[in-house]
Design a protein with these regions (language model features):
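Terminal alpha-helical segments
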Residues: 1-93
């Protein structure tokens, strides 16, 4: 039986998010805007998954929906931010 390591899982999500954010930044500098947005979305998704794991002590759900992940995070997120997350989710397509 495999034991779920919360700390290791959070570290994985955050390190992966940092890598994706760096990739997105490079794409932005080279004016490849759609791809930069895609990687920015991935970074946000992974940060939210790390927060979900931290707050629930369970694996993050298998989803790309930023609004769904935000709702699972147990954070009090202003509606305007949730609206932005919904818009960002469109760039994962």
């Amino acid at each position: 039986m495999m034991i779920f390591d919360v700390t290791k899982t959070i570290k994985y999500w955050l390190e992966s998010a940092a890598y994706d954010l760096d990739t997105g930044r490079s794409l932005l500098e080279s004016k490849r805007f759609p791809y930069a947005l895609f990687f920015a979305h991935l970074a946000l998704e992974k940060i939210l998954k790390a927060i979900v794991v931290k707050s629930t002590k369970e694996h993050a759900p298998f989803t790309h929906s930023l609004t769904f992940l935000a709702s699972k995070s147990k954070m009090d997120i202003p509606e305007s931010i949730v609206d932005n997350l919904a818009e960002y989710t469109e760039f994962h397509i």
